[in-house]
Amino acid sequence: MSQNSEKRHVSFAAIDQYVETNIVLPTEKVTNRDFVEWGKGNNYPGYLLDLYNNVTTLRSIINGNIDFITGDDVTILPLGERFADGIMNTRGDLITDIVRDLAKDYNLYGGFALQIIRDHNGDVAEIYYIDMRFIRSNKENDVFYYNEHWDKGGRKDVIIYPKFLRNLDWTSLSDEERDRHASSILFVKNVHTQVYPAPMYAASVLSCEIEKAISQYHWNSLNNNFCPDIIINFNNGDPGDEIKEEIVSDLEEKFSGYQNGKRFMVSFNKDRMSAVTIDAIKTDDFSERYKALEESSRRQIFAAFRAQPLLFGLNMDVSTGFSTDEFEQTFKLYNRTQIRPVQRLIADAFDRIYGSKGVLTIKPFSLESNTEQEVN
């Protein structure tokens, strides 16, 4: 057989681009333990907190909502004569700070929790904010389990609390029952058909992951000096499937995917004359495609909150701009549909604890011509 007619065998392996997602679904798993697990690994709240810490758009919206919900001032009726106005417990927590924490948890997780401490007469003596990340519940939401290390199994140091019941007949309770109800949990959630709440942006979690991945890609592209997509040729013959897989796996682990901002292709050739040739491997409009994807993801996140970007200092339509009147009208609608309902939930929670109406007052977030009424 002549050299021209010799059949050449080229072994080729392409490393597919790999965009790792660690999406944790909000599953509710009933196990042999007393509480219902919240997400894979019982760590759905931890996953949402990670998104908040790493997705700029999500963090901006939630932080803005916290400011809007807390308003310009928060006041509450004093808890007896023990504390000065606005102080809610022996730790010295102010009602304004507690409302901010509740607003954050509601926007981040879809619910919030408060710990209520009673005195020896059964009266409410102290109120504490409880981080929703650390709360798990039984199916009926009448027993709660507190642990700061659910992500590590949460089998140790679990504190059990009953549901807060305002109208307990304290005098008729046994000593054991009084001890059990001396500290209880008020658990507020935005859905009543499942054990745990659901964040408003649940449908846009994938968009959050995309924005997070794009930021990671650009960061690593910068660290890698914007190295272009390339093909790697091994021109010393076919080493066999096992060794090829080992080489490809090693390269893939080190260099492929959004976390390294580049993509490799590998070719195993008999010699240099057999090397694979590829033209125009790099996409000319790559950066534009990323930009379009990033903008689409950002819009999806805003849509999940029913929010307008201009309320949070971002004008995505730079060709038009916006006026003060447009901002005020947009804010009034957003305040009525998205902010005041959360303020009402928080105010109602304190009404339930105190056993009377109008104990908490939130002064609305002020605009120059704001005429909103107080929430109490």
Regions found by a protein language model. Name each.
Residues 373-376:
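Extended, compositionally biased alpha-helical segments that mediate assembly or anchoring
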